[in-house]
């Protein structure tokens, strides 16, 4: 019996796959537990339509990430931080991913989730720094920071 998997089933198939499985297994397990549905021509047509719309949405998200990358990498986009500095040249407060995301939003209107900013450790020194940011699975960029003394 041909079925369309509605969820991942270990050892059998992934969500959205159309596969031939034993009839008893399909009727007694997959269909009853709503893990799959019978692969009729109508159901396969619906699946293809859903896959096309998902691909279109993914392409749109990728295009937005590419646009955001060009915005971030332009010469004019440099996030300014003015921090108090101690006698040893280190800032009193540290600059975190959350702070970078907030300043980017405030200064340029670019909204990025703080979890996408790949900051190994907090920044505590003054100067110019480039911080990597992951915008999409296929798109990554750099945020330029300019940390100055107050």
From Swiss-Prot:
HAMAP family: Ribosomal_bL9 (MF_00503). One of its GO terms (molecular function) is structural constituent of ribosome. NCBIfam families: L9. The keyword Methyltransferase does not apply. The keyword Lyase does not apply. GO terms for biological process: translation. Binds to the 23S rRNA. This is Large ribosomal subunit protein bL9. Keywords: Ribonucleoprotein, Ribosomal protein, RNA-binding, rRNA-binding. It comes from the Bacteria. GO terms for cellular component: ribonucleoprotein complex; ribosome. Belongs to the bacterial ribosomal protein bL9 family. The gene is rplI. It comes from Streptococcus agalactiae serotype Ia (strain ATCC 27591 / A909 / CDC SS700). Gene3D superfamilies: Ribosomal protein L9, C-terminal domain, Ribosomal protein L9, N-terminal domain. InterPro entries: Ribosomal_bL9 (IPR000244), Ribosomal_bL9/RNase_H1_N (IPR009027), Ribosomal_bL9_bac/chp (IPR020594), Ribosomal_bL9_C (IPR020069), Ribosomal_bL9_C_sf (IPR036791), Ribosomal_bL9_N (IPR020070), Ribosomal_bL9_N_sf (IPR036935).
């Amino acid at each position: 019996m041909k079925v369309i998997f509605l969820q991942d089933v270990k050892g059998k198939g992934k969500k959205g796959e159309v596969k031939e499985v034993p009839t008893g297994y399909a009727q007694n397990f997959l269909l009853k537990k709503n893990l799959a549905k019978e692969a009729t021509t109508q159901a396969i047509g619906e699946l293809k339509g859903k896959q096309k719309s998902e691909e279109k949405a993914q392409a749109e998200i990728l295009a937005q990430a590419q646009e955001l990358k060009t915005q971030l990498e332009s010469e004019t986009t440099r996030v300014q931080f003015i921090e108090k500095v101690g006698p040893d040249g280190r800032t009193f407060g540290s600059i975190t991913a959350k702070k970078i995301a907030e300043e980017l939003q405030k200064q340029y209107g670019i909204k990025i989730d703080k979890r996408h900013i790949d900051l190994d450790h907090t920044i505590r020194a003054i100067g110019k720094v480039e911080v990597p940011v992951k915008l999409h699975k296929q798109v990554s960029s750099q945020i330029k920071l300019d940390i100055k003394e107050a």
